[in-house]
């Protein structure tokens, strides 16, 4: 079975970026303008970040979290 790395990504409304809020890889921090760009960045930097500790193959599991305010329009 392949090892799995977990990343919880959150949306920062003020900065306009997705960032790594929690991860199973200690010290891994990054951000990107879109969730897809964050995924691409993680796929590139994780092997370099882990160096010799990186297994030959692994699974990257990203849980994305964002919150939006819902406003009910007044009935006419």
Where are these regions (language model features)?
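Short, charged, surface-exposed hinge/linker loops at domain edges
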Residues: 1-8, 14-15, 36-76
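Short aromatic-glycine-(Arg/Gly/Cys) micro-motifs in beta-strand/loop hairpins
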Residues: 10-25
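Short acidic, gly/pro-rich beta-turn/loop elements at beta-sheet edges
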Residues: 17-19, 30, 40
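A short, exposed loop/beta-hairpin motif centered on an aromatic-Gly-Thr core
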Residues: 26-37
């Amino acid at each position: 079975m392949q090892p799995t790395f977990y990343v919880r990504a959150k949306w920062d409304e003020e900065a306009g970026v997705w960032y790594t809020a929690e991860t199973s890889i200690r010290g891994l921090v990054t951000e990107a303008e879109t969730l897809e760009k964050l995924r691409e960045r993680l796929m590139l930097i994780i092997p370099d970040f882990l160096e010799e500790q990186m297994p030959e193959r692994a699974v990257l599991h990203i849980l994305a979290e964002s919150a939006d305010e819902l406003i009910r329009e007044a009935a006419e």
